[in-house]
């Protein structure tokens, strides 16, 4: 069974833990990360380990490889109203290399994930370049993906082509102020919905019908402000990020992300955070259609809804310069999310649907 959009987003967030460096003129440090993640919300649980190792090759090249497992148990409202609860396993293999040339870093990456009814293959390339003594960094990114879509116990087969373009600029404004602006475009064509879901027409279940193309865009502005202590040293930072999303399905979305990072003593680094998200519904979405339409969807992720997330991350430095490691940290991350739907009802109760989700991660990181 195909995983929900949130689970895929969680996956991307975990992968971002091991992303290329933020500064183009320095290759990443050698490191290894072992992670366990757990998600529970809306009748779906996802858990599993992740492993990544990154190693420098000379002074200009850094290579990495990653492996993730998701064990999924799903009894979400979509499943309970249109199908049967299921269990699923998803695996992902990835790898990449970053090459440093002067003030420019070029990165290449490949990714393959596999479920019983969905196989995704992605190739990506990035370029970052620093100017003005590192005060300004420009970044470009391109990803191309080919997904194969199936349906268990049937011979159904289709595909999705995906092309992603990214542009970004980061500017050091003062010694304690950093700003960045990012643009993203994703062009998709193919089978863009789930073969398991159904729409409702006058209370009856009918097959969903989606457009076979979707273009989506996003702009994001981020601000990081360093905060000092009595001795004048920066030991904390405040982060603010706003993202606006729009697409050709008439969805409009706003995201506001606030976080605060500070040190507690010599070993602890803590990061409380809050995120608000709100989106409008797709033009062909309805909770219950009154007449037959060319395109018809009842995916709650295309409806009008909002979410509020409150979380915190804590990192504890275990030791330095022992067991062949320069530094080892133990990290914990927890987030509680509340989803509220404006025009999606639970057909079992007739009430507007809402649910809470909990996300927990624990990982061990070592630099060598």
Regions found by a protein language model. Name each.
Residues 51-55, 95-99, 125-129, 167-171, ...:
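Residues on the lipid-exposed face of transmembrane beta-strands in outer-membrane beta-barrel proteins
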Residues 36-40, 69-73, 101-103, 112-116, ...:
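Transmembrane beta-strands of outer-membrane beta-barrel pores
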Residues 44, 66-96, 135-200, 215, ...:
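Outer-membrane beta-barrel translocator/channel fold
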Residues 32-34, 65, 108, 138-142, ...:
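Membrane-embedded beta-strand positions of outer-membrane beta-barrel proteins
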């Amino acid at each position: 069974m195909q995983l929900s959009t949130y689970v895929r987003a969680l996956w991307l967030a975990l992968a971002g833990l091991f992303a290329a460096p933020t500064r183009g003129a320095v290759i990443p440090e050698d490191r290894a990360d072992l992670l366990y993640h757990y998600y529970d919300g809306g009748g779906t649980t996802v858990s599993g380990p992740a492993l990544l190792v990154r190693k420098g090759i000379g002074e200009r090249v850094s290579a990495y490889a990653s492996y993730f497992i998701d064990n999924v148990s799903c009894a979400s409202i979509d499943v309970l109203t249109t199908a049967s609860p299921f269990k699923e396993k998803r695996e992902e293999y990835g790898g990449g290399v970053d090459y440093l040339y002067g003030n420019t870093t070029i990165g290449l990456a490949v990714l393959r994930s596999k479920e019983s009814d969905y196989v995704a293959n992605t190739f990506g390339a990035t370029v970052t370049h620093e100017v003005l003594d590192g005060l300004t960094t420009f970044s470009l990114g391109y990803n191309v993906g080919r997904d194969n879509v199936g349906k268990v116990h049937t011979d159904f087969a289709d595909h999705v082509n995906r092309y992603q373009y990214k542009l970004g600029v980061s500017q050091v404004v003062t010694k304690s102020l950093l700003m960045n602006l990012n643009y993203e475009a994703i062009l998709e064509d193919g089978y863009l919905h789930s073969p398991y879901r159904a729409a409702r027409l006058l209370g009856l279940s009918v097959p969903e019908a989606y457009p076979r193309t979707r273009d989506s865009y996003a702009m994001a502005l981020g601000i990081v402000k360093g905060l000092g202590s009595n001795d004048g040293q920066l030991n904390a930072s405040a982060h603010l990020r706003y993202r606006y999303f729009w697409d050709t399905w008439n969805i409009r979305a706003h995201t506001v992300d606030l976080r605060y990072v500070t040190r507690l003593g010599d070993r602890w680094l803590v990061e409380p955070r809050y995120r608000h998200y709100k989106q409008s519904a797709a033009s062909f979405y309805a909770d219950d259609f009154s007449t037959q339409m060319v395109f018809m969807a009842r995916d709650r992720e295309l409806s009008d809804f909002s979410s509020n997330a409150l979380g915190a991350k804590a990192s504890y430095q275990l030791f330095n310069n022992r067991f062949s490691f320069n530094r080892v940290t133990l990290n914990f991350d927890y987030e509680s999310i509340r989803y509220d739907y404006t025009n999606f009802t639970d057909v079992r109760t007739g009430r507007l649907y809402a649910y809470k989700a909990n996300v927990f991660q624990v990982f061990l990181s070592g630099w060598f």
